Amino acid sequence: MAGKRRKKGRSHSTRPATPTVPKWIQYDPEEIEEIIVDLARKGYGPSMIGIILRDQFGIPLVKPILGKSITEVLEERGIKMVVPEDLFRLIEKAVNLRRHLEEHPKDTHAKKGLLDLESKIRRLAEYYKRVGKLPRDWKYDPQQAKLLVAGGLYREEKPAS
C-alpha cells in the first residue's frame, strides 16, 4: 500500500546513493565555482543553480566535487543571501498575494491564504533566529518585505581575503 503523502506516480529525480565525483564531469572545480557565481549574478537562487548544473552541465551534486555547498561557494566569493532562500520565496509569494488583494479586496480565499502564508513566514523566521541564520531582532513587516523582494536575494560584499 502506498504511503499517505505519495499517491500514484510523482515524478522526481533520485539523488545519487553515494555522493562521489562522477567520471563524466568535464569541468574542474574552479570552472564550476565560476559557473555558480555567474548564475548567482544573473539572479538565480541556490536551488535553481543546482538544477541548472544538473540539467545543463551534467553535474549531479556540487558538494562531492568542491567539498562545499553552493551557498558556501557564494559566501566565499562575497555574494551573501539577504535571508535564507526558502524564507525569501515565501516573502515573495506574500508580496504578490498582497498585490492581488489590493486589486481584488473581496477575495476571501486569498485573504485566508495570506494569513496562513504570513504565519508560515513567522514560524520559519523564528527557526532561523534560533539557529542563528537571521538576527535576533529580525521581524517580518509587509512594507519592508516589498523592499526586500525588490532588492533581490543576494547582496554582494567584498570577498573575505
UniProtKB/Swiss-Prot annotation:
One matching Pfam family: Ribosomal_S13_N
Keywords: Ribonucleoprotein, Ribosomal protein
UniProt cross-references to CDD domains, sorted A to Z: Ribosomal_S15p_S13e
InterPro entries: Ribosomal_uS15, Ribosomal_uS15_arc_euk, Ribosomal_uS15_N, uS15_NS1_RNA-bd_sf
GO cellular component: cytosolic small ribosomal subunit
Compositionally biased intervals (Basic residues): 1-13
GO molecular function, a single term: small ribosomal subunit rRNA binding
Disordered: annotated span: 1-22
Highest rank taxon of the organism: Archaea
TM region positions: none
One GO term (biological process): translation
Subunit composition and interactions: Part of the 30S ribosomal subunit.
NCBIfam families: PRK08561.1
Family stated for the protein in its record: Belongs to the universal ribosomal protein uS15 family.
Name used for this protein in its record: Small ribosomal subunit protein uS15
Organism whose genome encodes this protein: Hyperthermus butylicus (strain DSM 5456 / JCM 9403 / PLM1-5)
Top-level taxonomy: Archaea, Thermoproteota, Thermoprotei, Desulfurococcales, Pyrodictiaceae
Gene that encodes it: rps15
